[in-house]
Amino acid sequence: MTKIRVWCFIFLGILSRLSGYAQPTGLVNYDYNYDDKIKTVILRPYGSTVGFPMTYLNSDRPLELIFDDLNGDFVYYKYRIVQCDANWNPSQLTELEYLQGFNDQEIREYAYSINTRVVYTTYNLVFPNDLLSVTKSGNYLIHVYRDDDNTPVLTRRFVVSEQLFGVSAALASSLEAGKMMEDQRIDLSLTTSQR
């Protein structure tokens, strides 16, 4: 009986080591740069100069991630999207439950610096995109890592929201001439989306 237990522990130990083999290790669940050569990290709504990194589910308004690599040479970077709970810890959902497409996609847009004292490469990613999109609202992390050795480069938080209802308001003045400036009415209208 003890031989079986020993073999079970050995098997479980090997299995636990292999299951995390392809994933970047040492990741944190907050905005963080793992590499000192990564600078000017911006995550914002696409087309905006500033803004909270939030998009709507099934929206045509994606997010844009931009960062500079001061190493100067081109590096193959990949990204991974992870859904989180309210405390920004990874959720228990599988990727099939919150993603459409495959995780671990390459960042394909980049540009070299021109006429600068410091040589750097700017990487640009617009997501959700045709290769990977989110199917559930919630808190998310995007992890960027080097393709060759899975070394983490940066982590950023973003939110995917879902418009389940809308509120509109209209002001109406009193019809009596003497009370026009004193009595007003606010008409609120709530609309819900069909699910």
Task: Identify the role of each PLM range.
Residues 86-88, 132, 146-153:
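Short acidic/polar inter-strand loop motif in beta-rich domains
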Residues 86-94, 166:
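Short aromatic-acidic-glycine turn motif
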Residues 1-26:
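Bacterial Sec-dependent N-terminal signal peptides
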Residues 99-120:
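Extended, solvent-exposed segments with strong compositional bias
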Residues 33-83, 178-194:
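Contiguous beta-strand segments within globular domains
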Residues 25-31, 160-183:
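Low-complexity, Pro/Ser/Thr- and charge-rich linker/hinge segments at domain boundaries
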Residues 93-96, 151-155:
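Local beta-strand/beta-hairpin segments that build beta-sheet-rich folds
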Residues 119-147:
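Ligand-binding face of N-terminal immunoglobulin V-set domains in extracellular IgSF glycoproteins
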